[in-house]
A protein has these predicted regions:
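ATP-dependent adenylation/nucleotidyltransferase module used to activate substrates
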Residues: 1-160, 171, 180, 187
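AMP-forming adenylation/ATP pyrophosphatase catalytic core
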Residues: 127-134, 138-139, 143-359
């Protein structure tokens, strides 16, 4: 019996997962590649299937797997993705929030379904091209999620959902590397995607028009409504409250003599409140659906650094436990446009303490 540890490489067709696969093969793991088929293009008003990326991406992943001489499969998770990622994406927008579907995909697809798939094939680990690090705390035995060594590429914010079991069975071989080094390896090995651009968009909304996607997907039409000022006075008409997010300035179509920003939405009455930028700042948020990583649970107030959006620098804050598994985060300084549906992630240095969804 072969006791060599086995690794399932989640291959997107991009250079990062390609080099991750190469590094795991070089390290002596029994490797298998897999690309997720997540939805049908009919969901986008197109024909055919779509994977987590594009048909070309699947071809690239398959070509790399062939070059590395590792087995490769495309796995079909369209039903699960429709329910757990697309469904939540639409529900969050319709409830007035702004979702982060990449986090939900990590939670329910890449590190849940793929780990099940790996175990079903006698493999020990799921491997991705994410920029983050995993270590075990020698004192507590807990598995820790840490920032990437090169923080300009760090993706720990979207990985806070990983459980202890998932962290124990996940490898991030790129966590201590920078992008130029990764491309250099890909070029040296002659991989077809060595110079391929990084993907930026939500995979199932490639044109960025998420409202158009929602209307095609649901068959709904999101009607026009009123813009209100902070005193409740009608100041204009909008094109559907789902189109706007907290802090937005561009695309409002309002000429009120001074810049205004989206400050709030009432989805029941289909109104969008706008006001001066000063209305966007607050020190406090409440979050739920929390996943703790470096600690088992929060039992007393804790000093942390917190970020409430992906591109934000962490800010000093205190986190307080509330009833029903909720937490309150109080920032030392007011923060701009804290947005329902987004994630708040807590850090202690380069270690992720935990994270949850802003309510």
């Amino acid at each position: 019996m072969d006791n060599t540890p086995g690794a399932l490489i989640a291959m997107s067709g991009g250079v990062d997962s390609t080099v991750a696969a190469y590094l795991m093969k070089q390290a002596g793991y029994r490797c298998m590649g897999a690309t997720m088929r997540l939805y049908q293009n009919e969901d986008l008003g197109q024909s055919g299937f779509h994977t987590c990326c594009s048909a070309k991406d699947v071809e690239d992943a398959a070509e790399v797997a062939f070059q590395l001489d590792i087995p490769f499969e495309v796995v079909n998770y369209t039903e699960e993705f429709r329910e757990k990622v697309i469904g939540k994406f639409i529900a969050t927008y319709e409830a007035g929030g702004t979702p982060n579907p990449c986090i939900d995909c990590n939670r329910t697809m890449k590190f849940d379904k793929m780990l099940d798939f790996a175990r079903g094939h006698g493999l020990d680990y799921v491997v991705t091209g994410h920029y983050a690090r995993i270590e075990q705390d020698p004192e507590t035995g807990r598995w820790l999620l840490k920032k990437a060594l090169y923080t300009d590429k760090d993706q720990s914010y979207v990985l806070y959902v990983l459980t202890q079991d998932q962290l124990a069975h996940t490898k991030f071989p790129l966590g201590s590397m920078d992008k130029p080094s990764i491309r250099k390896i890909a070029e040296a090995q002659g991989f077809c995607n060595a110079r391929k651009h990084d993907s930026q968009d939500i995979c199932f909304v490639p044109d960025g028009d998420y409202v158009g996607f929602m209307e095609r997907y649901t068959g709904k039409y999101y009607p026009d409504g009123d813009f209100l000022d902070v005193n409740g006075k009608v100041v204009g008409r909008h094109h559907g409250a789902v189109r706007y997010t907290c802090g937005q300035r561009k695309g409002l179509g309002l000429a009120l003599g001074a810049p205004v920003y989206v400050c709030g939405k009432d989805m029941e009455h289909n109104t969008v409140t706008v006001g001066p930028e000063s209305e966007l700042f607050t020190t406090t948020l409440v979050a739920g659906d929390f996943n703790w990583i470096s600690i088992p649970e929060l039992t007393e107030p804790m000093r942390v650094k917190a970020k409430a959006r992906y591109r934000q620098t962490e800010q000093p804050a205190t986190v307080y436990p509330l009833d029903s598994g909720l937490v309150k985060v109080v920032f030392d300084e007011p923060q701009r446009a804290i947005t329902r549906g987004q994630a708040v992630v807590l850090y202690d240095g380069d270690v992720v303490v935990g994270g949850g969804t802003i309510l």
